[in-house]
Structure formats: C-alpha cells, structure tokens
Amino acid sequence: MARRLLPAHVQESVTFRDVAVFFSQDEWLHLDSAQRALYREVMLENYSILVSLGILFSKPKVISQLEQGEDPWMVESGVPQGAHLGWESLFGTIVSKEENQEVMKKLIIDGTFDFKLEKTYINEDKLEKQQGKKNRLFSKVLVTIKKVYMKERSFKGVEFGKNLGLKSSLIRKPRIVSRGRRPRSQQYSVLFKQLGVNTVRKCYKCNICGKIFLHSSSLSKHQRIHTGEKLYKCKECRKAFSQSSSLTQHLRVHTGEKPYICSECGKAFSFTTSLIGHQRMHTGERPYKCKECGKTFKGSSSLNNHQRIHTGEKPYKCNECGRAFSQCSSLIQHHRIHTGEKPYECTQCGKAFTSISRLSRHHRIHTGEKPFHCNECGKVFSYHSALIIHQRIHTGEKPYACKECGKAFSQSSALIQHQRIHTGEKPYKCNECGKAFSWISRLNIHHRIHTGEKPYNCKECGKAFSSHSGVNTHRKIHTGEKPYKCNDCEKAFNQSSALIQHQRIHTGEKPYNCKVCGKAFRQSSSLMTHMRIHTGEKPYKCKECGKAFSQSSSLTNHQRTHN
C-alpha cells in the first residue's frame, strides 16, 4: 500500500508534514477498520506526547478530524483535506547554552552534556523529578536535543516518524494495542534513548575521587588505582598489573607480537597507542600544544616531558648519586654510568654505548654521513651539536664566560678546561710516570713519550712528531713563516709560546719559582731542569756506557766522546 510523505527530504526547519504519515482517499479506503483504528490511536498518542513535551502551540486540523471521527485522507494537491498548516515548527525552538546547562546539570550523571558524545547518561530518578515539575525550560531543551539529533543522524520523513512512535507497520497488518497511555516517565525515557541518550536507574560512585561508573565491576577495577592492588602478574618477569587488559598488552613485550600495522608504511606495533602516535609522522599532525611557548607535539607524553622545561620539575632521581632528571629515559641512561652497562654495540667495530642515540651518532663515523649543513659556509657535520658550535664562528657568540677572569668561550668544554688554570686541577694522570695534566689531550700527547709514537709527519722532510701542533710549528721552518712578532724589538717567532717567553727578556718576568731554593726562571722547562739538581733525577741515559745525565744537552755532549 502506498504512503506519501511531504516533503521527501529533511529541511532546515522540520514541520509536522515531515514526520506525519498521510494517505490519499484511495489509500484510506483500502484500510480495514482495525487498521484505521490503530492509525487514529497512534496519531493521537503521539500528539499527546508532543503536547506533554511542550512542543505544540496549536492543534493540527488532522488531530481535530481524528478526535471527531472524520476521515483524514489527502487531496490530490498533496495537502490533507481540511488540514490547518499553522503548526509551529517542531524544531524551531532554540535553547541557549546557559539554559541547556541549567537543565542538564540536574539530570546528567557525569560531566557536561554534549550532543556529540557517543554516550551521555541521564539518571532516571532525576529525570522523573524534572518531568513531574512540568518545567517549560526542560521541554524547550528536549526540543533542541531532537533538532540536533535529527541533523546529526540525517533521518528523513517516516524514519524520524518511527522514532517519535509513528508506527508505519500499521498499514501491513492490524495488531492489538493497549488502550492505556504510556506513563510520562516512560515517554521521556524512550525519547531520550531514541535520541542517543542513555538513561540509567543506578550508578556507582568512587568514594575516593568521585568518578562515576555504570557497572560495579568497572568501579572495582577503578578502585585498584587508589589501593595499588595488582592482581595480574606476568609469569615471565613477575611484573604485576591492576587490570587483565594491561597484562595482555605487556605480554607482547615477551612474545614480540605486533598486531597493529601502519597502512602507510607497513610498520608494526605492539600497542594501538604506539600506532596512533606513529601515524602522525605520516599525517604531520601535532595535536598537543604547549600553553607556555606554543610548541606542538605528536604525543601527550612528549608534551608532558617538554612542560618540565618550563616548570623545572625533575621527578626522576638517581638512588646512587641523587642526581635528578626530567625524563625517565634520561635516568635509565644515567644509571648505566654507575653500572657500567653499555647495551648498544656497533656491529662494525664492536664499540659499545650506553644509549641508542649515541650508537646512531657513532655509526656516522663508518658511513661518513654528515647530515648537518652550515648555511653560511657550506661545511657539513656528523652531529647537530657540532654544527651549533661551528655556527658561533660566524656569529661570534661566546655564551660560556669564566666567573674568575671574565674570559668567554664558544664551548662549555673549553670553559671547563680553562677553569682548571684557576683551580690548578689536573684530573688526567699518566699511568707510567704519574705525571698529571689539566687536559686529556695533553695526557694523550704525553703518552707518546713512553710509547715513542709519532703519528704526525712533515710532508717536506719526513720528520715525525707526537702532536699535531708540533708538526704545524715545524712546517714554519720550511715556509719561513714567523707570524708572532715582538713589539719591543721586532723579532719574529714561528710559535706564540716562543714569543711569550721572549717578551720576558724585556719585562724581566720570571714566573716559575723553585719551591726548594726560591730561584726563579722565565720558562717552565728551565725550572724542571733545575729541579733535578735537588731531586738527583737523571732521565737521560747513554746507550753505550749507561751513564745518566740530568739534561739532554749534557747527554748530547757526552755521546760525542764515543764517536
């Protein structure tokens, strides 16, 4: 049997014709008496519901016809015979945000009401109390709920009519219906459920934090957060969890299972949260924004770590030395200093590292990769930190200043080394002779005295040197270059140290004093030679006869006696 619905699409403002079922005269005549009676009852019942909701402001003609027992068939123009079209729009009423909150805060169990939420729960007890008050503002809110619901679900005509209780099945077969009207509390509850709002009679509240749950089992699981109870234990590592789902996820660490696969690149993950975070690499999405500086992040954990820069919070503390860190991963890496653990090993040379980032940096030695490029001069670097230090050559920036003398440096390591001049600290000690040095580079050069290693060769004459600076100084003999000039006598030198020593002739300065006899010297080497008088040390030994001397010049003179 045909049915006609006017109009056939959902308009911005929906009228009675959008939700009512109409029949032509021919269609109406084909209904038997039971079907006509059922139609009358359903239409009148729905009219009663709409009136109880405070939606209708005038009685439609079709309702008057049904009440008077007239036939409500439709004429050819598409308008019900004698129908009065002066209905107010069912959904023309708009509720302000304040009105909505005023009503809904009396009904909703947990949180502010939001039409877009998948689930919103209203307490039936509270609902019935509001219904009993015949609150017009409450009815107004229900109207707006239905308007939003219809727009979001895109219901059309008779489909929405079904949700209001217009039983289109009446034209298929007659059925017996109860003569009694549905209680108002049930009418409201059914309406809310049809609109995607769940009503519940009972809920479960946490006494500790006030959070509300729909099931007692959910509350029990939640309360383990407060009690610290962990019932589910991993058989592999004995780690315990408060929920079985957390244990299931953890087991993937041991099994290596990675069920979540990225559709873009095929990479697999053990946890869905890891996959979601990874996918933001492809989309470029960075939904987590720092309120302090505006910097954005792909994950909430990255934002939390970053915010500690602003707060200065360092919650992760080393039990060994008390040093604190802002990130757990930094503490784990730091612990390896105490344990000596170096779990990341280079497959090329076998060298091991405390962190994977340091291993990645080390790999560039083998690959020759230099991904960091200076925009000023084009020089490339293996490490980002090296690029930053290099750029200070162009900018002249020297951010590290000595508090003792004010001298500034472009690198923190240079400042640390410089400060040893003031403190006299010499932390690098030679295992062979016990001599100590302020800088490790000086110790490395010194070691070559014992090993005899001279890795730096002069390309002009082939002479070898134990240090790079030594060969550079030597090359100036071949070039004749003497860039260091005395302002007093114009004498020039190929080493800055030679100029400094020379200038003491003019100034008379003798900064090196013997602690035994008080004699002073212009050069540290002269003081060292002098000290052998007091100590009796004779380090220069003749290979021919075994005689020893305190000075190398004395050995040279002696060796001539054997020639």
Swiss-Prot record:
Protein name: Zinc finger protein 879
Organism: Homo sapiens
InterPro entries, sorted: KRAB (IPR001909), KRAB_dom_sf (IPR036051), Znf_C2H2_sf (IPR036236), Znf_C2H2_type (IPR013087)
Paired cysteines (S-S): none
GO terms of biological process kind: regulation of transcription by RNA polymerase II
Entry GO MF terms: DNA-binding transcription factor activity, RNA polymerase II-specific; RNA polymerase II cis-regulatory region sequence-specific DNA binding; zinc ion binding
Domain of life of the native organism: Eukaryota
Keyword Metal-binding: yes
Pfam families per UniProt: KRAB, zf-C2H2, zf-H2C2_2
CDD domains on file: KRAB_A-box
UniProt entry tagged with the keyword Zinc: yes
Zinc finger (C2H2-type): 204-226, 232-254, 260-282, 288-310, 316-338, 344-366, 372-394, 400-422, 428-450, 456-478, 484-506, 512-534, 540-562
Alphabetical UniProt keywords: DNA-binding, Metal-binding, Nucleus, Repeat, Transcription, Transcription regulation, Zinc, Zinc-finger
Subcellular location: Nucleus
Domain KRAB: 14-85
SMART domains, per database record: KRAB, ZnF_C2H2
Family: Belongs to the krueppel C2H2-type zinc-finger protein family.
Function as written in the Swiss-Prot or TrEMBL entry: May be involved in transcriptional regulation.
GO CC terms: nucleus
